[in-house]
Amino acid sequence: MSRQLVDIAYNAIKNNKIYNKKPFTFDDIINEIVKNSNVNLVEVNSQLGVLYTTLIQDTRFISIGDLEWNLRERLSLDEITKINNAMYEVGLYKDSDREEDEHEIVKNDKLTQSKEQEESDEVSSLSDFVGYEDEDEEFKNNNTSNKDEIEDEEELEEEE
């Protein structure tokens, strides 16, 4: 449905002399859709998000900034290039990518250090448990010696 609405808007704006070489707004697009179709404003408003997304993806339209649009076919290649350069600020992505890469490297280094520290802590914690084996043996020995003492005491009591 939204593709059909964009087609209606394209044909209406292309054939309307008011918009000849003159930018138009998203509201103008909506008004042209309502005027040139059997779709009412409520139906169009319920489709605004999808309509806007479809409009952005449609190569016949170009956003020229400041919430204004134009038909790509009405602009020269130089004008389109200027708009694209202004919109995307040529070179900005390379700089921001480099900054993001550096940020990612620092972030990954911190994560690696954190994981290494956790592993180190786990190893030291596990080494604490290694000593428990000796303590278990000591406990067993104490229990056996305690049992022996109890048995000796029971024997003495029986003799008496």
From Swiss-Prot:
Composition skew (Acidic residues), residue ranges: 149-160
Family: Belongs to the RpoE family.
Matching PROSITE patterns: HTH_HARE
Skewed-composition ranges (Basic and acidic residues): 104-117
Region of interest called Disordered, as start-end residue ranges on this chain: 94-160
Function: Participates in both the initiation and recycling phases of transcription. In the presence of the delta subunit, RNAP displays an increased specificity of transcription, a decreased affinity for nucleic acids, and an increased efficiency of RNA synthesis because of enhanced recycling.
Protein name: Probable DNA-directed RNA polymerase subunit delta
Chain ranges of the HTH HARE-type domain: 3-74
Species annotation: Ureaplasma parvum serovar 3 (strain ATCC 700970)
Highest taxon, organism lineage: Bacteria
A single cellular component GO annotation: DNA-directed RNA polymerase complex
